[in-house]
UniProtKB/Swiss-Prot annotation:
InterPro entries per record: Capsule_synth_CapA, CW_Biosynth-Accessory, Metallo-depent_PP-like
Segments of skewed composition (Basic and acidic residues): 1-19
Renumbered residue ranges of the record's region Disordered: 1-21
SMART domains noted in UniProt: PGA_cap
Superkingdom per UniProt: Bacteria
Family as reported in the entry's similarity comment: Belongs to the CapA family.
Keyword Transcription regulation: no
Known function: Could be involved in the biosynthesis of a cell wall component.
Keywords, ordered alphabetically: Plasmid
The keyword ATP-binding is annotated on this UniProt entry: no
Disulfide bonds: none
UniProt protein name: Uncharacterized protein y4sH
């Protein structure tokens, strides 16, 4: 892509000729500014110069943008010299990548990446820190983890020819012990992720709630009883009455206020602001975002964000355009090159494998086929084609607003052998049309109209 000077073509947000005394949050990029956004980057080896058919076309898309974003959902270190350990709390698998991944991602075109997710501390603080070191040395800006909450929640800045870009990254899906905190009194800070805590409630019909109340009251030591006839707590789960049975979420007010302030702060120091959130809620099975997410995305844009990029469920969810800003509720998987090794002793145990008999690859295959363990059994298997289909989203901005969004359907080699699948290529026409028609259906409830030209989705404003 042709790069223009930082001043040429700029539609500057002037304060009516007045001096900026408050710290403006207006967007201020050169016309033609482009952002590429993709979903989860789960990659274990170098690929930029590899033999994977069709991947070079994807790299061309990544390299052509001013800013290219992905969710960094792995840790990078050399296991031979690593001084950390796999944690008892982990994100469902111990993701690990070779140190060469950092320079390789940079060579592909990635220059900015989110770090806050449920895998950020799979290998402890040591894994988090080593990944940060390698990304820093590779020249990739990253946000969402740090030595304190203040560091993890802060905007990180990328200089481009068309404007300065701020990135903020948070996770609503995270392992409890990975949440960062700031110092208080004599207690030091805790390293970890920028977490947005959610309170989940199960919505049930009134007669269901009464049945649950009877169960609660029959249990020994049921705990304090509330007179509220529309809510109760049973075995640590909150139940509420409502019209539609399902799940509802409420964001922690302190976390949300801190995040909104940091978005405002990040935008005051930049020309363009990306906010990214890792959200599996209500579950990987759902094509729709959880009920908190639309309000969250809109509040973030109101606070100064120019794009909201969601990821987590490993599948596509809908797209909304709000105030001429894109909201991607999930961009699914971009890489699912899950050749991780070592997988850790806990993974062998979970999938009833023997490290003296079975292999890391066989553990990974079992995990992807069976899913993750819960009290009710295994759930969340990722062995369906939908998890190997996504899009590369290319947003072009004119006059500081979204002018066009191009959606390039990709497929990740669902039917290939384990050693070869998980690397994206442009989807063949029939599959591309199917992916885009699904995205049309998922985006329609948000009032978004996607047209299909050849095998590319288009949103024009």
């Amino acid at each position: 892509m042709e790069k223009c000077s930082h001043e040429s073509g700029r539609h500057s947000a002037e304060n009516d000729g007045k001096y900026d005394i408050t710290g403006s949050t207006a967007t201020n990029v050169v016309d033609g500014f482009t952002m590429v956004a993709v979903g989860d980057v789960i990659v274990s080896r170098t690929l930029a110069n590899g033999h994977h058919p069709g991947f070079s076309e994807i790299v061309e898309l990544l390299r052509a943008a001013d800013v290219t974003f992905g969710n960094m959902e792995t840790l990078i270190f050399d296991i031979r010299s690593f001084n950390g350990t796999p944690q008892a709390e982990y994100g469902g698998a111990y993701h690990v990548s070779l140190p060469e991944i950092g320079p390789d991602l940079k060579a592909m075109g990635f220059n900015i990446m989110g770090r806050a997710n449920n895998h950020s501390l799979d290998w402890g603080v040591e894994g988090m820190r080593e990944t940060s070191r390698i990304l820093d040395e590779s020249g990739i800006i990253h946000a969402g983890v740090g030595e304190s909450r203040a560091q993890a929640s802060a905007a990180r800045l990328l200089e481009t020819a068309r404007g300065r870009v701020a990135l903020l990254s948070c996770a609503t899906s995270f392992t409890p012990m990975s949440r960062a905190c700031d110092p208080a009194g004599e207690a030091p800070a805790r390293p970890g992720v920028n977490a947005l805590r959610l309170e989940r409630s199960v919505v049930v019909e009134p007669d269901m709630l009464e049945s649950l109340r009877k169960i609660r009251d029959a249990l020994p030591n049921p705990g304090p009883k509330h007179d509220d006839r529309e809510m109760l707590v049973l075995a640590g789960t909150t139940y509420r009455t409502g019209k539609d049975v399902g799940y509802t979420y409420a964001a922690n007010t302190r976390d949300l206020a801190d995040i909104l302030r940091n978005v405002r702060r990040g935008k005051q120091y930049s020309d363009f602001c990306i906010f990214t959130n890792h959200a599996h809620e209500p579950g990987n099975w759902s094509e729709e975002p959880a009920d908190f997410e639309q309000a969250l995305a809109r509040k973030l844009i109101d606070a100064g964000a120019d794009a909201y990029v969601g990821h987590g469920p490993h599948r596509l969810r809908g797209i909304e355009i709000y105030k001429r800003r894109p909201i991607f509720y999930s961009l699914g998987n971009f890489f699912y090159d899950d050749l991780r090794t070592p997988v850790g002793a806990d993974m062998y145990d979970v999938y009833d494998k023997d490290p003296q008999v079975d292999t890391d690859a066989e553990v990974t295959a079992a995990e992807e086929t069976m899913g993750y363990p819960t009290a009710a059994g295994f759930i969340g298997a990722l062995a369906e084609p939908v998890y190997y289909e996504s899009v590369v989203a290319v947003s072009r901005f004119e006059e500081n607003q979204l002018a066009e969004l191009r959606l390039y359907p990709i497929e990740l080699g669902y039917s290939k052998r384990l050693a070869n699948r998980g690397v994206p290529s442009l989807a063949p026409r029939p599959q591309a049309i199917s992916i885009l028609e699904r995205l049309q259906r998922l985006s329609e409830p948000f009032g978004t109209r996607i047209t299909i030209e050849d095998r590319v989705g288009l949103i024009r404003l």
